[in-house]
Amino acid sequence: MLAMPMLTACNTGGLLGRADASAPLDCTRYQEKAPDNGAPLLLILLDLSDNSPETAGRVTARTQPYLDTALKNGEYIRLVASGGGPMTYSDCFHGDRMFQITRNNDRREEKDRLAASKVLSQEIDHIVQTERVSPKGSVTGLLAGINDEINAVRSTPDVKVNEVTVLVWTDLLGTGQESDCLNVDGKKASVSIAEALVKRCFETRQITSVGNDRVRFIGVNEGSADRPQQDLARYLKGELCRRISSDCS
């Protein structure tokens, strides 16, 4: 799957001093200079099987706690989405600047941080609802690109990444070509089938390990899939976690 950047606009309402609610979001309002020893990277990957407002709401609800943490501790954020076609990149979450909210007053800082995370969540909502969703596709391409995305951030001038969290929204119920190792068309729900599928992913190097980088799968079993599909997705998550990272859940 070829990565073709598609810059998205940040269209959100007027919190934290933005005068014109119809104007694009000025993401620099939520960014600070990173310390000399660097900052963590939050890499958000969105594998979208639909772009409904309901799905957008679920995605933003699950990602917002990670945005809260990033704004509290100071983190770079990079976001990549795919609905089965080309990759979409957010010009807000590009990974080149550290996001952080700091204030002299603790109560004010917490209030502004929560407000900022809600504003930034609307960028994610916008990306989900505007993403073109193909009838076929899987998370394989996004997982395959993790190391490249991390390296792209690390190679950015004046950016120093000291640890990585990869946040993956996916239902793990991809459909596509037979060559796609995570194509679950016609597959029964069993641990052995999930193990065979994931083993093939790594043997064919469609997916490779990210080593010690932290990986968190969200979105599994949160849609309208039936029980056998939910079981298969859960088994696939377990097998992927066993192979993709030493810190995965």
Describe each model-derived feature in a short phrase.
Residues 6-9:
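C-terminal motif of bacterial Sec signal peptides marking the signal peptidase cleavage site
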Residues 11-14:
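Bacterial signal peptide processing site
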Residues 19-40, 44:
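Post-signal peptide N-terminal segment of mature Sec-exported envelope proteins
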Residues 21-22, 173-230, 234:
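VWA/integrin I-like adhesion module and closely mimicked acidic/polar interface patches used
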Residues 36-44, 73-79, 164-166, 206-221, ...:
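Hydrophobic beta-strand segments of well-ordered beta-sheets in folded domains
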Residues 38-162, 165-167:
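Von Willebrand factor
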Residues 49, 172-173:
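Catalytic metal-binding/acid-base residues of hydrolase active sites
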